[in-house]
């Protein structure tokens, strides 16, 4: 039988150790490469951090599998058993250019169910963590259940790309929403955006394409505070594929989906 309390304690220890290693690396020169496009950055620290987790998971939990952004884990085609979904540095562009607004993100799943979610804002030493059925926390502070919000008073996290000409959604769909809400924010790290939704600092987050390692941990957090998340089509996540994401408190999710996203059909 899986000892989830032990896994939770060990994962928290590892994520803080990895954060300390990243902090130390900020005083050293980075090796920066590009992946799918010139703005899709990866550094030697991304790769080293992913390897840090893989080495420890394989040694401590040899039966567990790993889905990592940098491709050093396993080839995952199902979520059978225990699977760690890891983004060693979510917000690499921020890490390179700002040395802030990035996070380590780890979701741990068993047979497709999110059991543990960890998002560590390294620079601010804020660890958002959730254990299925036991609540969500920021460090030692328990996160409150999300409150209902009217759209006119909502803070929406959205990248400006989605209200300009792009190939994923007509810019006219979301522009009226941006005008209607109280304000918008963009942090450049999907994990931190989802953590901020779970913490009630922002009311909703919308984006057109995220990989499983971008959203897995955040979804575990949202489960524990009563948040809602789907694709922009209203479909559930597979946690194996790239998806669009609409996440927020239930009332805001419902309003955005019904009045803006579903209406576009």
Curated annotation (Swiss-Prot):
PANTHER family: INOSITOL MONOPHOSPHATASE (PTHR20854), INOSITOL-1-MONOPHOSPHATASE-RELATED (PTHR20854:SF4). Disruption phenotype: No visible phenotype during 5 hours of growth, decreased resistance to oxidative stress caused by diamide. Mg(2+) 1 binds at residues 69, 87, 89. The lineage of its organism: Bacteria, Bacillati, Bacillota, Bacilli, Bacillales. Belongs to the inositol monophosphatase superfamily. The keyword Magnesium applies. This is Inositol-1-monophosphatase. The gene is suhB. Mg(2+) 2 binds at residues 87, 90, 214. Gene3D superfamilies: 3.40.190.80, Fructose-1,6-Bisphosphatase, subunit A, domain 1.
